[in-house]
Amino acid sequence: MQLSDFSFELPDELIARYPLETRSASRLLHLDAKGQYHDHMFTDIIDLFEEGDLLVLNDTKVMKARLKGKRTTGGAIEILVERMPNHTTAYCHIKASNSPKAGAELFVGADNIPVIVRGRHENLFVVEFSQPILPVLEQYGQLPIPPYFNREAEEIDTERYQTVFHNPEKIASVAAPTASLHFDEELLAKLDQKGVKKTFVTLHVGAGTFMPVRTDDITNHVMHSEWCDVPQETIDLILATKARGNKVIAVGTTATRALESAAQAHGGKIAAWTGDTQIFIYPGYEFCIVDRLITNFHLPESTLLMLVSALSNRENILAAYEHAVKDRYHFFSYGDAMLIDKLEVLKLKLG
């Protein structure tokens, strides 16, 4: 399967660079189990879900992971904190005119807080901070909004690039689980009143989510690693949901990857799991847990577009995207949403 199979043309003006005034006011394109698409508003999910269905949400919180700073020579640098193995050590991306070497001292924030580059961890720099990292990020950092916004983070992003249900103890993502940004408290309350249940997984989104696929044959692509947790409480609710014939609805590709990673770790069984995942879902993948997916519109040739193409199929997804472009849906993190049903497989009866 070739990378070019997942290409499409997107006019620049359809990229949403700011959020709508109301989270749930976005549009929704429903791609059903027969591969047919239908136009809706996002709040129509109340009617598209059944009592007893289960929403699975990613409760991670985005950290202000981008720090501006300088070298001892005064040259500008930018640090993007990706992971924190402990409270004073971070694995980071560093933008600089020349790549810093082990032992280099850098300074971040208005108060010139010193940090030391200790070496490399895979493709990331190991950076030691002179004080706990999270307070430094909170005081001096910026939210690492996506590059396709073509702007710096603003005050509005502080609220709107976080989900309303994030767990403040789980602050470790460098990008939002953006499908969840459509949910506000009022919509969640209405779903609760209908009897739609909800539960949580955690996947801390890494900067690799924005990395392009660089291999023509997509099966040669190596996914970035992200930490996730699928707790037993969530598994119990999933098993109960499937036992009564209801649907498991993953909110976002991150929740999907967490759930399917747990299943893959147990040989296809539905079971709790915590660990690092590099799961790469593309057409041909057999989903173990997810029945339906709420997701945004994704970049051409991205691993996320490949994932959604595995749930329906590539032709259906690209046809839906073509309709979305013609009908002026908005794309990417602050854009509109899709509800994608797992494609029905027709089984022929032989007489």
From Swiss-Prot:
Keywords: Cytoplasm, Queuosine biosynthesis, S-adenosyl-L-methionine, Transferase. One of its GO terms (biological process) is tRNA wobble guanine modification. Its EC number is 2.4.99.17. Pathway: tRNA modification; tRNA-queuosine biosynthesis. It is an enzyme of class 2 (transferase). It is found in: Cytoplasm. One of its GO terms (cellular component) is cytoplasm. InterPro entries: QueA, QueA_dom1, QueA_dom2, QueA_sf. The keyword Ion transport does not apply. It holds the Pfam family Queuosine_synth. It comes from the Bacteria. It catalyses: 7-aminomethyl-7-carbaguanosine(34) in tRNA + S-adenosyl-L-methionine = epoxyqueuosine(34) in tRNA + adenine + L-methionine + 2 H(+). The keyword S-adenosyl-L-methionine applies. Its main location: cytoplasm. Coiled coil: none annotated. GO terms for molecular function: S-adenosylmethionine:tRNA ribosyltransferase-isomerase activity. Transfers and isomerizes the ribose moiety from AdoMet to the 7-aminomethyl group of 7-deazaguanine (preQ1-tRNA) to give epoxyqueuosine (oQ-tRNA). Belongs to the QueA family. HAMAP family: QueA. Monomer. This is S-adenosylmethionine:tRNA ribosyltransferase-isomerase.
